[in-house]
Design a protein with these regions (language model features):
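Conserved N-terminal beta1-alpha1 strand-loop-helix module at the mouth
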Residues: 1-143
């Protein structure tokens, strides 16, 4: 199991991550969300994190071109897609950025998992409800 702290917004959050050493530190880089940060802030946070922690940029329904543009300023290690992105978008993001692409999906049925596998992401993040809700997925479906 690997751990990602997500929604990181402040240098104090990064200091906490540096102390606890999760494998990943996630930052919301799409506008319109409570924990969204600017690319400028993300750049500062990435510079402050421990080298042993990978930086994950979380994007919601953005184009591969937009994500690649953000990457010019923010040195990310992983791209996480958290919207209704298609396999074509997943592939386009990977091609444009050269980074691993993770895809978050809501899991209500076994068919949801099968459909998610067709997206071609490097990793799937399986959720019970949309991100940050604290609702556990049905572990029986995932097993």
């Amino acid at each position: 199991m690997k751990i990602k702290f997500c929604g990181i917004r402040r240098l104090e959050d990064v200091a906490f991550c540096n102390e606890l050493q999760p494998e990943y530190l996630g930052m919301i880089l799409s506008s319109g969300f409570r924990r969204t940060i600017s690319p400028e802030t993300a750049e500062q946070l990435v510079k402050a994190k421990s080298r042993s922690i990978a930086a994950v940029g979380v994007f919601v329904n953005e184009t591969p071109e937009h994500i690649a543009q953000v990457l010019k300023q923010v040195p990310l290690d992983v791209i996480q897609l958290h919207g209704s992105e298609t396999a074509e978008i997943v592939s386009g993001v990977r091609w444009r950025t050269g980074l691993p692409v993770w895809k978050a999906v809501q899991v209500q049925t076994a068919a949801d998992i099968q459909a998610a596998r067709q997206l071609g992401a490097d990793r799937l993040i399986l959720e019970g409800k949309a991100g940050g809700m604290g609702i556990t997925a049905d572990w029986e479906l995932i097993a």
